[in-house]
Amino acid sequence: MTIRGSKNSYKAVTDEEGVAVFQDLLPDVYSLAVSYVLPREEYGNMVNPPIEANDVLLNGTLPNLRIYENYNGELTLQMGVRQSLIFSKIYYSGTKNANNKNYDVDQYIELYNNSDQTVSTENIHIALLETESTPWFVEEKEQYIYAKDIFKLPTRDLEPGKSILIARQAIDHTIDAPLSLDLTIADYEVKAVNKPQNSQVEQLPHVYKSLATLDWLNMVVGGGNQLVLFRYDGDVNDLTKKQKPDAKPSHAWYVQIATSMVLDGVECLKYNAQEIDLSKKRMPARIDASYQTLSTASGRTGESIERKVARVEEDGRVVLQDTNNSLEDFVCTSDIRPLIYTKPELQPQ
């Protein structure tokens, strides 16, 4: 439970009856997020006949819980299934170059196979969701989300504990920005027209653009950035497209994505010291019950949003935390190096 729009949190564990008790709360407006992981063996034995399944994630959220006196209430949880391929790191803040000028072409996204099985990336897409100032599809939120940009992963097999690194520009950014990083190690590059490119790095196909002029990895430096992984075996250009009400035909058209197709999602909202604007949240609780932020609203801080480590298996394979609750699963770190999971701030507490 957090005071609405902040990161001041209170935690409680439910008893056998599913009751959680919070004591000594200050009168305020709170956001309540609940997460529970039901192991696959336990879930498989709960249904008849027993089945083989991944871990089941139970999540729920109450974003505007007003507590000014003793409160008793119930929260219905939504069920999701833990996925193999997940977001592990998202770097969008940018930094400063050697002349102290804004530098944000070093953005990257990292994916990770969090399972013990090899997975295929066939028909898997990455979508950046719309972030209009006024939410306009609240009533559809449980069934649909809307994408402004969609990228399609080339088909490949990804072994357990391995990553995919996607760069906005797969170049050595430390040449111009000493505080940045070398992204020549990227697996894929979003090759924008008339922008520096690395011919040695494979292109990540940009299969849908809400605006033709936005042909790069279009993450907002300070946030928000809402990202989802989803699987679709057709052409995403054939999916339903909608505009914000009262928009002109020349304005952005967004692709409608059924939430049932989503494999993983992360809400990176814009930081605000007074109150984080939760109206910008786009995903239902079963995809992301909360959010994560940078430490400032303006970005250029050289910070990334990175998933915590849950445990390390005997064979050395890192298992990342995944409860579909970004406040619990991710941290904001000033160590922006990709592909590294030994950072102290990522370790189990």
Label each residue range with its predicted role.
Residues G60-L62:
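Long, low-complexity intrinsically disordered regions enriched in Ser/Thr, Asp/Glu, Pro/Gly
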Residues P27-Y43:
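A short, solvent-exposed beta-strand micro-motif common in secreted/extracellular proteins
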Residues Y10-K11, E17-D24:
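Short, surface-exposed beta-strand/beta-hairpin micro-motifs centered on an aromatic residue
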Residues E16, L26-P27, P160:
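Surface-exposed loops/turns
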Residues L65-G73:
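Extracellular interaction modules
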Residues R4, Y10-K11, E42-V47, I51-L57, ...:
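Activation on beta-sandwich/Ig-like modules and their edge loops
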